[in-house]
Amino acid sequence: RNGNRVIRPFRRSVFCKDPVRPPSDTIIKKGIMENQTHSVPRIGEKAPAFTASTTQGPIRFPDDFKGKWVLLFSHPADFTPVCTSEFMTFGAMSRDFERLGCQLIGLSVDSLSSHLAWLHTIRERIEFNGMKNVDVRFPLIDDVSMHVATLYGMIHPGESGTKAVRAVFFIDPDAVIRAIIYYPLALGRNFDELRRVLVGLQTIDRFHVSLPADWRPGDEVVVPSPGTMDALDRQEEHPADGVTCHDWFFCTRKLTEEEQQEMAIG
């Protein structure tokens, strides 16, 4: 007590507490804390299963496509110019993908009736880059509910919260995701690259090799490095026919004509 003044012990106010940082998967929007989790399947994981209605009838993925490679890809919206150019290219290349043992499956968050009307318009009215009367016969998923798009992490809120980005999932015959490519809404895909990645993955699996930068079919492949000192010594003393070693860990070779023909046959 100091005269008429009472001095009380200091108590830390609740307003002085250290700020509590929200979890990393939590965002604060308009003063409301909302938990938002965005699950994105990763390379090497099993592709998530789903059932869906498509322009080719109902599908069960991956059960309906056992033993096949699959390109599962999303586009932002029907009746848009960049997506139209892509679907014309996918349609024109569909037989090429079939020869590679690969099934195309498209997706957007549009309805089945929208898909059908759009594909009909592409076939009957659109001409682009020398392509016309393109008849798209691979499945295009009705995903108005955004179920599949969310399952595969195709909705990127920073780009759009209501449209899928241009995602491409390369899925092998065992339903394992082997590669993923994303493009933004305004940029159409590079179809030569899509084909290169598919052929590259098939080459890797068939011949147990790796592929160097900018590899294209017919280029040299990278052979496995020695795993022991004995193997390293054998490689230096008796290099395999057709193998060029740039150093002990970096050796390449050309696929033989028989191997290249085997790839062409599929």
Question: What positions do the PLM features span?
Answer:
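Chalcogenol-based redox active-site neighborhoods
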Residues: 31-266
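Generic short N-terminal amphipathic or hydrophobic helices
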Residues: 6, 26-27, 31
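Extreme N-terminal basic, low-complexity initiation segments
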Residues: 1-12
